[in-house]
């Protein structure tokens, strides 16, 4: 799949945590070089499940609840650590699926916390 991406794509996306996408991006960069393409021409985006909590005490329980899926759980400060690690891994865009963030005002509040407290680590 990365061979096709390296030849034809403008953007590459995968569900991931920072270490996974960093390793896969390195593979993509090598595939680009093998195909004579500048790896910088391909934007990288990712997504994971997000659970915004008031405390990190239960974060591991949320991560285990969705075992096998990329997941970030905890306070906005803890989420910001992952956001910064994605940035350092070369990610250009993080997609935040909102179906794990509650409903109505709870969802809006969680998104606001991500935007205001965690997203600045990506800039």
Residue spans for each PLM region:
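Active-site-adjacent structural elements that line small-molecule/cofactor binding pockets in enzymes
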Residues: 1-123
């Amino acid at each position: 799949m990365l061979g096709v991406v390296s030849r034809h794509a403008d953007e590459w996306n995968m569900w991931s945590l920072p270490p996974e996408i960093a390793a896969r991006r390195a593979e993509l960069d090598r595939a680009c070089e093998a195909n004579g393409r500048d790896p910088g021409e391909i934007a990288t985006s990712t997504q994971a499940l997000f659970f915004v909590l008031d405390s990190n005490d239960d974060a591991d329980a949320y991560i285990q609840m969705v075992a096998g899926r990329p997941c970030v759980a905890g306070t906005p400060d803890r989420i910001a650590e992952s956001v910064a690690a994605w940035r350092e891994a070369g990610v250009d865009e993080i997609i935040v699926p909102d179906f794990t963030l509650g409903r109505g005002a709870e969802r809006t509040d969680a998104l606001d916390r991500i935007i205001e407290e965690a997203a600045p680590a990506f800039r």
